[in-house]
Swiss-Prot record:
CDD domains: RecA
A molecular function (GO) term: ATP-dependent DNA damage sensor activity
GO CC term (a single one): cytosol
Species per Swiss-Prot/TrEMBL record: Mycoplasma mobile (strain ATCC 43663 / 163K / NCTC 11711)
Annotated Pfam families: RecA (PF00154), RecA_C (PF21096)
SUPFAM superfamilies, A to Z: P-loop containing nucleoside triphosphate hydrolases, RecA protein, C-terminal domain
GO term, biological process aspect, one: DNA recombination
UniProt-recorded name of the protein: Protein RecA
Keyword DNA damage: yes
Length: 331
């Protein structure tokens, strides 16, 4: 029986190529590689300390909620590790200066501003098959307009064209990603379902295919504004992991996005350090190693911004504590 199975496997491999079929235990590269999102809070909520390589990720939410900011931070992290990233700007709205402020090396970022949805997704497929690109960001699904719609008149209604386009493209792209270990992040918007009286009236453009093929789906929402004096300097946002094939879903992350600077990593470190009792609070005063270091959270953030050695020391302790198995009982 064992010999028969071995012969069958050899026959299939001979016909369809090496590794077309195998025993699960013989597959050495099944362990998913991870890269940081650039946010300590999001890394922790994902349960795997970052985004997986070779998978599709959807980041969706209302306008100005921080979707593109999260994607740009992911690009910066890939580039820091020596990887190559591409940005498919279907909305034709990328801000090079903002990307640079977030740590993106714009000189090494591949940019495409396609004319149609077909062109955009074909470029994604070619880049993925090349095995030379580590991360591709598509901004956004809603802007992937099918050629049949572009070539038609304003009065024409083309039902389901974008959904069919996405379904066909994702079937091709998914197979390429597994071999190349390229990650694709699709940024998506939110639409209201017409005539919905019960249940969630919100939906995302592009049909059901993207929901199905995505290994991770993040719902990004603005919670409140952040003010410095009388000036609004940023937003507090909530990220909910609504789908996660690699860890437990439905976890939430909260972070602060500072205008022109992106995710405040110092704010994240302070919140985690306080929750983990690395930094303790007595009234308005903050203590570290039983020493009074700052009065008020804003002063603590200013201190860590100026004192890189102290910030690095606290951050190292936070990351170490988060890696422990009992961290969920602490937070």
């Amino acid at each position: 029986m064992e010999k028969e199975i071995k012969n069958i496997l050899m026959e299939i491999e001979k016909k369809f190529g090496k590794e077309s079929i195998m025993l699960l235990g013989s597959k050495q590269d099944l362990n998913v590689e991870i890269f940081s999102t650039g946010s300590l809070a999001i890394d922790h909520a994902l349960g795997i300390n970052g985004f997986p390589k070779g998978r599709i990720i959807e980041i969706y939410g209302p306008e100005s909620s921080g979707k593109t900011t999260i994607a740009l931070h992911a690009i910066a992290e890939i580039q820091k590790s020596g990887g190559v990233a591409a940005f498919i700007d279907a909305e034709h709205s990328i801000d090079p200066n903002y990307a640079k402020n977030l740590g993106v090396n714009i000189d090494n970022l591949i940019l495409s501003q396609p004319d149609s949805g077909e062109q955009a997704l074909e470029i994604v497929d070619i880049l993925a098959k090349s095995s030379s690109i580590d991360l591709i960001v598509v901004d956004s699904v809603a802007a992937l307009v099918p050629e049949v719609e572009l070539n038609g008149e304003m009065k024409d209604q083309v039902m389901g064209a974008q959904a069919r386009l996405m379904s066909k493209a994702l079937r091709k792209i998914t197979g390429s990603l597994n071999k190349s270990k390229t990650t694709v992040i699709f940024i998506n918007q939110i639409r209201e379902k017409i005539g919905t009286f019960f249940g969630n009236p919100e939906t995302t453009p592009g049909g059901r295919a993207l929901k199905f093929y995505s290994s991770i789906r993040l719902d990004v929402r603005k919670v409140s504004s952040v003010s410095t004096g009388e000036v609004i300097s940023g937003n507090n946002i909530k990220i909910k992991v609504v789908k996660n094939k690699l860890s437990a879903p439905f976890k939430e992350a909260f972070t602060e996005i500072v205008f022109s600077k992106g995710i405040s990593k110092i704010s994240e470190a302070v919140e985690f350090a306080e929750n983990l009792k690395i930094i303790t609070r007595k009234g308005a005063w903050f203590y570290y190693n039983d020493q009074n270091i700052a009065q008020g959270k804003s002063n603590l953030k200013d201190l860590l911004e100026k004192n890189e050695a102290l910030y690095s020391e606290i951050l190292t302790k936070v990351i170490s504590a988060l890696s422990k198995e009992n961290v969920n009982s602490i937070l």
